[in-house]
């Protein structure tokens, strides 16, 4: 038995002590986690800057602050979330009472990506703790400084074998995903998600897969172009475009395309200055592998660049880039970009834009900028996507009352707020029947009982 397997079975043993099922225990662990995150704030911010070049304002808002808010909500609502439900019972089951009891799955695996390497460990972990599970965390090896901080924080905060961190790369992940966990929560690419799903199926382990895809932005002829440009630039170029719900491409009505490109270019200068590489507010690509993938896409689209296009390998810097005259068969349109390159395509009618999106895998997010209520309702009703926004980008993630998750190729399952608790919770149903009364209608022999059975099911 290797070290990873030993940690897995030790975690299972801790769960079997029944300690995590106590509500006061769960609330105390969440309280300890909140305190630890606050204590480690400067270390977390420094690690995020080292690994991804994140400005501390952006890093706090998208990694630390949102996590602390989720802990606060979970602690406040946990008593209500965990209540056993007494549900209605049909008359033909009299004298019976029916219940749904919330119970933890057991020992869960959380695999996190590099783009929000702190938040995307702790958001699902909050749900796992609140639901009463033990957990093993696999942070991304592409953000090693953040991973080391997470491991120190976890080891200093929680009991051994309760919450564990496994560092490493592909080999460690392969070992983990083939173990018989009670639940697997994965955030990452579609290709790796398929591998995780297949491995989990060998042990019939339920999964949540949070993946990505090409999330479109539709800008119609009624849109407020200035507002659209600001909110699109924020959504696309935050974290240097390395956001699973970032706008991947724009579908703009041909009549306002030139105005939009002008506005986007102006907004980028307002956000990051004339020399964007020197801006303290603009991030970096996570590593050279992803840098070279993105510069290859840039090189294939040199004739289409209308803003940006510069890069610096030593700094893993890629300038925010706008591409015009892009077609559906362009190289940039064949894969999720996951970087600061924004293709702009045009359409003539909303029917055409909707058909374009219909022909592609269901996106994780979709955004529409429009003042036309009819257009808004058509997009919401006719297109399938994980989540999205009208006249904004990204910000639907900031509401913990909304479920977050994909559909189709962009993922399965959902979390955030109570939905995180629900994800890591098994709803166990049972009935309690009195021994004092028994109709006997459902028991053999059945002679003469047919009319009574029919009568029961009419009620």
Question: What is the meaning of each model-derived region?
Answer:
Residues 178, 211-212, 243-245, 278-279, ...:
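Short glycine-enriched loop/turn motifs at secondary-structure junctions
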Residues 158, 191-327, 390, 448, ...:
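ALDH superfamily catalytic-core signature
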Residues 1-99:
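N-terminal Rossmann-like NAD(P)+-binding subdomain of aldehyde/semialdehyde dehydrogenases
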Residues 91-227:
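Rossmann-like NAD(P) dinucleotide-binding subdomain of oxidoreductase/dehydrogenase enzymes
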Residues 21-25, 218, 317-459:
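Conserved C-terminal structural/oligomerization subdomain of aldehyde/semialdehyde dehydrogenase
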Residues 26, 71, 132, 163, ...:
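Residue-level signal for inorganic ion chemistry
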Residues 15, 19, 34-37, 41, ...:
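Structural signal for hydrophobic packing residues in well-ordered secondary-structure cores
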């Amino acid at each position: 038995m290797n070290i990873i397997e030993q940690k897995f079975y030790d975690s299972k043993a801790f769960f079997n002590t029944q300690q995590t099922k106590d509500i006061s225990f769960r609330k105390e662990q969440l309280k300890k986690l909140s305190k630890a995150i606050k204590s480690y704030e400067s270390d977390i911010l420094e690690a995020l800057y080292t690994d991804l070049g994140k400005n501390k304002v952006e890093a706090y808002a998208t990694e630390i602050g949102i996590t602390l808010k989720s802990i606060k909500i979970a602690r406040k609502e946990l008593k209500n979330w965990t209540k056993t439900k007494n549900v209605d019972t049909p008359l033909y089951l009299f004298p019976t009472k029916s219940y749904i009891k919330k119970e933890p799955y057991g020992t869960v695996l959380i695999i996190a990506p590099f783009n929000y390497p702190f938040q995307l460990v702790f958001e699902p972990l909050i749900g796992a703790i609140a639901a009463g599970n033990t957990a093993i965390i696999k942070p991304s090896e592409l953000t090693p400084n953040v991973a080391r901080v997470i491991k120190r924080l976890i080891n200093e905060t929680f009991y051994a074998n309760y919450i564990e961190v496994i560092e490493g790369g592909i080999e460690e992940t392969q070992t983990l995903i083939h173990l018989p966990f009670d639940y697997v929560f994965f955030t990452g690419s579609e290709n790796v998600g398929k591998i995780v799903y297949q491995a989990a199926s060998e042990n019939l382990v339920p999964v949540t897969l949070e993946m990505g895809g090409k999330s479109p932005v539709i800008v119609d002829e009624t849109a407020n172009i200035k507002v659209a440009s600001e909110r699109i630039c924020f959504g696309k170029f935050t974290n240097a475009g390395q956001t699973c719900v970032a706008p991947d491409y724009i579908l703009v009505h041909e009549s306002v395309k030139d105005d939009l490109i002008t506005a986007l270019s102006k907004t980028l200068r307002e956000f990051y200055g004339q020399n964007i590489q020197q801006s303290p507010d603009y991030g970096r690509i996570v590593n050279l592998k992803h840098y070279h993938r993105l510069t290859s896409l840039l090189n294939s689209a040199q004739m289409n660049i209308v803003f940006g296009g510069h890069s610096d390998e030593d700094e893993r810097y890629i300038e925010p880039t706008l591409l015009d005259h892009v077609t559906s068969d362009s190289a940039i349109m064949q894969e999720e970009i996951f970087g600061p390159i924004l293709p702009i395509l045009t359409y003539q009618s909303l029917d055409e834009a909707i058909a374009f999106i219909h022909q592609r895998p269901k996106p994780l997010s979709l955004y529409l900028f429009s003042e036309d209520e009819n257009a808004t309702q058509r997009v919401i009703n006719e297109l399938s996507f994980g989540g999205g926004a009208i006249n904004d980008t990204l910000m639907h993630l900031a509401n913990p009352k909304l479920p977050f998750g994909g559909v189709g190729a962009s993922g399965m399952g959902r979390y955030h707020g109570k939905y995180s608790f629900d994800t890591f919770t098994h709803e166990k149903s049972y009935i309690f029947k009195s021994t004092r009364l028994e109709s006997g209608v459902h028991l053999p022999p059945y002679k003469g009982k047919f009319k009574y059975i029919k009568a029961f099911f009419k009620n």
